[in-house]
């Protein structure tokens, strides 16, 4: 890359990076501005989500009251932007409103201390008290007729309750995307409550929304963790890699512009600024659709949809075809004598260009692998550009990439072969044993949940052809391991987990993969109550029964970390036979009591406990 070319690109990048797509003049009243931009319906929905994500224990009715008060105030400001308090920031207005809740100290304890702080510290304080695992009752789905009656009696309240229940259980759910889920939720009830067989129509749709919602929440949680724990630079690097894969025909300056604005949108949502986030996301979708000719050939269908569907579609759109005539990367990033000069002039721009060029050529790599390669390249330049002969030093840098690429390729190949051999449930059990031995201090429910989710990588990704396996698998595993990191951060019990979670975002998965059995772990005392079961297990769904069995498996490994595969297999087969036998018995409870004692004794003998 000639020096003059780099300078012109640097100018383009810098202006795009600092400016972005959004052009916002200062407004006298921010709340009036957002109300006018979003409209009353979206404004109220977003304020409800915001309050439910902060005050996760408050009753629905209390939140509705707060939302109505904020909405009436916003209307006052729309009528007269110079009215009293209309010039206050949204953080100030929302924070003041949160602090009026009479039961704040009683319900949330030390979170009430946030109210003594000034902005922006007050909002930061509220954010730190968001609970990823709130103590809320499990959502139980009512009968279909009951739901349809509630939907017809008061559609608005029914949909608000959906937003409220999801938002308070998922305090980082991407708010504009939750509005999209609510649109689909409403459509499902509108269609199915009129169907001949309401349940057959509705239940599969609700199951699909639930599963997609959990996945969407987990993906957004990783984005927020990236911003909160590793900073804006880490998020921008992720966005450069992902958008370059998705839009390989777009120019670097265009990708940079999109990255700047995508970062702004996610920073706002992760920071609780949901009105700004939704408004800016709509502007970004508008910009992408107005400039699709210079971005991607795959956007036309998305851009014809209504706003919420459009934004969702753009976020999920398939990768565009790679340009046919891309030159070798080596010329600009290895062979050129100007590498160190270009790097010294603008390190992040040069690394951003490297990441852009590498990612657009490799849709078959995971984003985290691309970021590992960029980090290796950066480390090499830091070392070599200070050496006596820089070019000689960095000439073989691409050779260092080979083991980094082969490690996830081999791991995915081995695990997909294992998955195809075992099936999902037994593959999950394999991971349960593996991870319990690595980090036995982690709570049993967390180990079960994380290992079950890790095990789903098989059915999610192994069916894909080779070029799509790695981006599917490794980026999915990053999302699941972030769930472990988030849950562990609240109540840390393992230095190994803390180390893998905090040292490097992109190396989390390799760090966990490399962990061996924890030899320092002192096995738990055997407790027969852990393995005592009752007749209620017979009425559980297949999924709930699996979780019961997997919970027992984790406990067995915690009692006997050095148990062999064969020993564990024998015990689990005996357990399955025991459950099957007693669930068929006439007197189930007696069977579970008598046969259960025998099972515990046999398990202890088999494991040498």
UniProtKB/Swiss-Prot annotation:
Entry annotated with the keyword Zinc: yes
Any Pfam family matching the protein: Serum_albumin
Sequence positions that bind Cu cation: 27
Post-translational modification N6-methyllysine, affected residues: 558
Phosphothreonine PTM positions: 107, 444, 446, 570
GO terms of biological process kind: cellular response to calcium ion starvation; negative regulation of mitochondrial depolarization
Key word Signal present: yes
Broad class of where this protein is predominantly found: secreted
Molecular-function GO terms, alphabetical: DNA binding; enterobactin binding; exogenous protein binding; fatty acid binding; identical protein binding; metal ion binding; oxygen binding; protein-folding chaperone binding
InterPro entries in alphabetical order: ALB/AFP/VDB (IPR000264), Serum_albumin-like (IPR020858), Serum_albumin/AFP/Afamin (IPR021177), Serum_albumin_CS (IPR020857), Serum_albumin_N (IPR014760)
Superkingdom, taxonomy of origin: Eukaryota
Modifications made to the protein after synthesis: Phosphorylated by FAM20C in the extracellular medium.
Keywords: Calcium, Cleavage on pair of basic residues, Copper, Disulfide bond, Lipid-binding, Metal-binding, Methylation, Phosphoprotein, Repeat, Secreted, Signal, Zinc
Phosphoserine: residues bearing it: 29, 82, 89, 297, 443, 513
Stored PANTHER family: ALBUMIN (PTHR11385:SF15), SERUM ALBUMIN-RELATED (PTHR11385)
Subunit structure: Interacts with FCGRT; this interaction regulates ALB homeostasis. Interacts with TASOR. In plasma, occurs in a covalently-linked complex with chromophore-bound alpha-1-microglobulin; this interaction does not prevent fatty acid binding to ALB.
Biological role stated in the UniProt entry: Binds water, Ca(2+), Na(+), K(+), fatty acids, hormones, bilirubin and drugs. Its main function is the regulation of the colloidal osmotic pressure of blood. Major zinc transporter in plasma, typically binds about 80% of all plasma zinc. Major calcium and magnesium transporter in plasma, binds approximately 45% of circulating calcium and magnesium in plasma. Potentially has more than two calcium-binding sites and might additionally bind calcium in a non-specific manner.
Name of the featured protein: Albumin
Organism this protein belongs to: Pongo abelii (Sumatran orangutan)
């Amino acid at each position: 890359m000639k020096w003059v070319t780099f300078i012109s690109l640097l100018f383009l990048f810098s202006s795009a990076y600092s400016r972005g797509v959004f052009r916002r003049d200062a407004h006298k009243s921010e709340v009036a501005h957002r109300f006018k931009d979003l409209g009353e319906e979206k404004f109220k929905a977003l304020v409800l989500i915001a309050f439910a994500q902060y005050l996760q224990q408050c009753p629905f009715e209390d939140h509705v009251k707060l939302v109505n008060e904020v909405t009436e105030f916003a209307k006052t400001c729309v009528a007269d932007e110079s009215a009293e308090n209309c010039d206050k920031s949204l953080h100030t207005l929302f924070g003041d409103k949160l602090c009026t809740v009479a039961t704040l100290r009683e319900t949330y304890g030390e979170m009430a201390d946030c109210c003594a702080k000034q902005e922006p510290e007050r909002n930061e304080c509220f954010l730190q008290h968001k609970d990823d695992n709130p103590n809320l009752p499990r959502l139980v789905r009512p009968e279909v007729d009951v739901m349809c009656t509630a939907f017809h009696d008061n559609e608005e309240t029914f949909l608000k309750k959906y937003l409220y229940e999801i938002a308070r259980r998922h305090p980082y759910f991407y708010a504009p995307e939750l509005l999209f889920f609510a649109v689909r939720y409403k459509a499902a009830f509108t269609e199915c409550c009129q169907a001949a067989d309401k349940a057959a129509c509705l239940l599969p749709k609700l199951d699909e929304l639930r599963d997609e919602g959990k996945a969407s929440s987990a993906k957004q949680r990783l984005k927020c963790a990236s911003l909160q724990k590793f900073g804006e630079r880490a998020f921008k690097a992720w966005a450069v890699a992902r958008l370059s894969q998705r839009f390989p025909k777009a120019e670097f300056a265009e990708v940079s512009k999109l990255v700047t604005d995508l970062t702004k949108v996610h920073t706002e949502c992760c920071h609780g600024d949901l009105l700004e986030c939704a408004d800016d996301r709509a502007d970004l979708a508008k910009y992408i659709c107005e400039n699709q000719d210079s971005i991607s050939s795959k956007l036309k269908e998305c851009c014809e949809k209504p706003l919420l569907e459009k934004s969702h579609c753009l976020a999920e759109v398939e990768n565009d075809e790679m340009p046919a005539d891309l030159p070798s990367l080596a010329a600009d990033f290895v062979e050129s004598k100007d590498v160190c000069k270009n790097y010294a002039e603008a390190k992040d721009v040069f690394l951003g260009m490297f990441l852009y060029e590498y990612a657009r050529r490799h849709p078959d790599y995971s984003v985290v692998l691309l970021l590992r390669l960029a980090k290796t390249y950066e480390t090499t330049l830091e070392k070599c550009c200070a050496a006596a002969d820089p070019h000689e030093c960095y000439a073989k840098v691409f050779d260092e990439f080979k083991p980094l690429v082969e490690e996830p390729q081999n791991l995915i190949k081995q695990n997909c072969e294992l998955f195809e051999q075992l099936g999902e449930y037994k593959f999950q059990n394999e991971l349960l044993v593996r991870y319990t031995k690595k980090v036995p201090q982690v709570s049993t429910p967390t180990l079960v949940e994380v290992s079950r989710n890790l095990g789903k990588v098989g059915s999610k990704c192994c069916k894909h052809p080779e070029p799509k396996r790695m981006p599917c698998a490794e980026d999915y595993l990053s999302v699941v391991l972030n769930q472990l990191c988030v849950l562990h951060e609240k109540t840390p019990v393992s230095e190994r987990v803390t180390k893998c979670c905090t040292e490097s975002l992109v190396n989390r998965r390799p760090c966990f993969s490399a962990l061996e059995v924890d030899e320092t772990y002192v096995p738990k005392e055997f407790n027969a109550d852990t393995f005592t079961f009752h007749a209620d297990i017979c009425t559980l769904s297949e999924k709930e029964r699996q979780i019961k069995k997997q919970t027992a498996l984790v406990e067995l490994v915690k009692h006997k970390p050095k148990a062999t595969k064969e020993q564990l297999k024998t015990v689990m087969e005996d357990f399955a036979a025991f459950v099957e036998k007693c669930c068929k018995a006439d007197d189930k409870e007696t069977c579970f009591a008598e046969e259960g004692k025998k099972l515990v004794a046999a398990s202890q003998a088999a494991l040498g406990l």
